[in-house]
């Protein structure tokens, strides 16, 4: 009997054997040695499973697959879980079961609804969105397109708040009241260390170019510990400033106000000239009484006047800078101080000579305008000009431009970008 069962080629003999029914009815487990049992403990196998494994009986048909249960409403695989947290792209509604599927009526002879695949016409969506306007600011006076709408207003507000922070503002006449005009070696060390700190803050490779010992030696310190003196002064300055070194300057606001400029030749010249005016204002202590944004807007005014040759302030510029004409006429710096300041420096490099040539042309333009019959600005306090004084730049750039109402350079875009109108910048331009 055992030989008949173990021989797979004697299937007919097994099927005809009279003891097959008795064998199948017998549920006694047969011993089967497992490969890893070591022959010690037999593995017990069901008789029916054993016969089907050796091919004596046909294999069983696989059981029908059970239908999958529907996912609960709070399953993480369904849109119901996320609700309003799902992203909404453009004008499309948020994803939901009703949007994704639209069940049809039950067909005849069927127990389950048929859900067709939802199709979206992409061409119609693109055509609808093509006529939508460019995203702009929430401000009612803002008309310019914004490069990065979610952050543009935040950057503007942060810069404006930082420049008006009393901690960030310099103390006027501080050296006169504390030093009385006396310069000491310690004060020179403070000045040199601040320049050293600023250079390291702006350029990480400064330590390879500037040595602290050389900085101390230029201040009159020749001892062996002069390097440590610079390090100690750095620590004291940083502690006094509470490590706040990133305040906005006129250079920062020139970059901010000209961020919409393209790569054209004229815009490039205006940007370079504005930076040149703003950088020069840092060398004059009197400009510290003006906000950096006002100095930057005045620099843009002078740059546009030099490049375009007519009135460089319009409504869009006032909205851009935040300064209007009335504000500048009362509180801003002028051009005569600025012209005299820049023309007294010696030019060594090609870039400086080019900038100096631009300044000379601006000076000649201003001198030519001195023969005009000046019109007093409305609401502005402008001293009368008597005599020649062309080289002194006794004519203000604002006066020269205000007598030419037919052309405007200070546009609404620049006014909106900087927040200054032409009226806001007049007095600041006068000081320049």
Curated annotation (Swiss-Prot):
GO terms for molecular function: cyclin-dependent protein serine/threonine kinase regulator activity. One of its GO terms (cellular component) is cyclin-dependent protein kinase holoenzyme complex. Gene3D superfamilies: Cyclin-like. InterPro entries: Cyclin, Cyclin-like_sf, Cyclin_C-dom, Cyclin_N. Keywords: Cell cycle, Cell division, Cyclin. GO terms for biological process: cell division; G1/S transition of mitotic cell cycle. Belongs to the cyclin family. Cyclin F subfamily. This is Putative cyclin-F1-4.
